[in-house]
Regions:
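Structured beta-strand/loop patches that form or line metal/cofactor-binding pockets in enzymes
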Residues: 1-40, 45-52, 340-347
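Extended hydrophobic packing segments that form well-structured cores
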Residues: 365-383
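Metal- or metallocofactor-binding catalytic centers and their adjacent structured scaffolds
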Residues: 37-117
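Conserved, mostly hydrophobic/aromatic
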Residues: 3, 34, 41, 67, ...
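N-terminal amphipathic alpha-helix/helix-capping segment at the start of soluble metabolic enzymes
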Residues: 1-5, 9, 116, 120-132, ...
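Glycine- and other small-residue-rich loops at beta-strand/loop junctions that grip anionic moieties
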Residues: 103, 171-175, 202-203, 226-230, ...
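Shared catalytic-loop signature of beta/alpha-barrel
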Residues: 65, 215, 221, 232-358
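Metal-dependent enolase-superfamily TIM-barrel catalytic cores that perform enediolate-based chemistry
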Residues: 127-244
């Protein structure tokens, strides 16, 4: 079997209601999808994440001009070989960022082909499923005004509860006083209802303010405090980690085994959050997972993107061992973004859907998606 072609699809659509996280306003949804075709007729799908405000054309250009020429004619099942070929070819200019996202999308598609060629889901190739269903947590609580939205966000918490979620992650980073008002309102709305809360500031604060916010919320029993400071500042992570009795999480903006080696060696986080669609794909993810396990750090993937990224991440999360074995161990949970995203339910025949706060792990070959090509045409970005 040989790789015959690699195509990218840049999707874009304006949002009816723009929303904000701490780093800016999201006014449209983007996606960079990757299709690898073979001379045998098998096709694999992957996704290169459009993180934050990243346009899809960046990763698409990297795939077309840097990766595709060195992969045509190769056996797509040579997963480690091709990952290293791509990495070494782009190392001098692409160890992180959009270039690594491009590599990730291709790698995911190759694993999809490998699974399909054997008739097994990718989690089987990764060593099997530790779990056949995964608890989902609602990521949301984005802003539509900026500040002063505690009442609306409290109502959102109630909606998530009614929709079956028993774990929720609240987006903060809009000023500490506003953050605390939001958290109090959310807690009041969920009073008497068993719910696990998490917070994510998307690196909005420096060390002093990150610690100040955490100390004010130490009595909440947070499952995690995500990205308290900037990803380039591991010393800051260490300072926050040492100052608080809250599990610290981070890593969505870190890449490959090499990046996580430095991140984990400083004992800066309790929970590592690589994103499959930018950390280097399945090939890098399994190495990052082994490294984290050796450091006693739980891996809980960051998940953002289309139905393809979600499906691939579900395969990975099924295969992740717990960091601390126990009869009632803390299991990885699935980040279920509840904001508007048309490239999910519409894009594939059987999207990732939660029911009563849980997601079943599919056993379809590869990553388990069948793409609706009409959606690729409907949302094609104009170049």
């Amino acid at each position: 079997m040989k790789i015959a072609d690699i195509r990218t699809y840049c999707l874009s659509t304006l949002l009816e209601t723009p929303f904000a996280y701490s780093q800016g306003w999201v006014k449209q949804r983007w996606a960079t999808l990757v299709e690898v075709t073979t001379d045998s007729g098998l096709t694999g799908w992957g996704e290169s994440i459009c993180m934050g405000l990243q346009p899809p054309e960046i990763a698409a250009a990297a795939i077309e001009h840097a990766l595709k020429p060195i992969l045509i004619g190769a056996d797509p099942r040579d997963l480690e070989v091709l990952w290293h070929r791509m990495y070494h070819h782009t190392r001098d200019y692409g160890q992180k960022g959009a270039m690594m996202g491009a590599l990730s999308g291709v790698d995911i598609a190759l694993w999809d082909i490998a699974g399909k060629s054997l008739g097994v889901p990718v989690h089987r190739l990764l060593g099997g499923a530790f779990r056949t269903r995964v608890e989902a947590y609602a990521t949301g609580f984005y802003r539509i005004q900026g500040q002063g939205e505690a009442k609306r966000l409290a109502a959102e918490a109630t909606v998530h509860w009614k929709n079956g979620f028993r774990a929720m992650k609240v987006k903060l980073g809009f000023g500490i006083d506003d953050d605390l008002a939001v958290m109090q309102a959310v807690r009041d709305a969920l009073a008497g209802k068993p719910a696990t809360l998490m917070i994510d500031t998307n690196h909005a604060y420096g060390v002093a303010d990150a610690i100040r916010l955490g100390r004010a919320l130490e009595d909440v029993g947070l499952r995690l405090y995500e990205e308290p400071v900037a990803p380039e500042f591991p010393e800051g992570y260490c300072a926050v980690h040492d100052a608080l009795d809250i599990p610290i999480a981070g890593g969505e903006n870190e890449y490959t085994l090499f990046g996580f080696r430095n991140f984990l060696a400083q004992e800066s986080v309790d929970i590592a959050q690589p994103d499959l669609c930018c950390c280097g794909g399945f090939t890098a993810a399994k190495h990052i997972g082994a490294l984290a396990h050796a450091h006693g750090v739980q891996v809980n993937p960051h998940i953002w993107g289309s139905a393809i990224g979600q499906a691939a991440s579900l395969q990975w999360i099924a295969s992740i061992p717990v960091a601390h074995h126990a009869l009632f161990a803390l299991e990885p949970i699935f980040e279920y973004d509840t904001s508007s995203h048309p490239f999910r339910a519409e894009l594939v025949k059987e999207p990732v859907l939660q029911k009563d706060g849980w997601i079943e792990v599919p056993r379809r070959p590869g990553i388990g998606v069948e793409v609706n090509r009409a959606v690729l045409e409907q949302y094609a970005a104009k170049r």
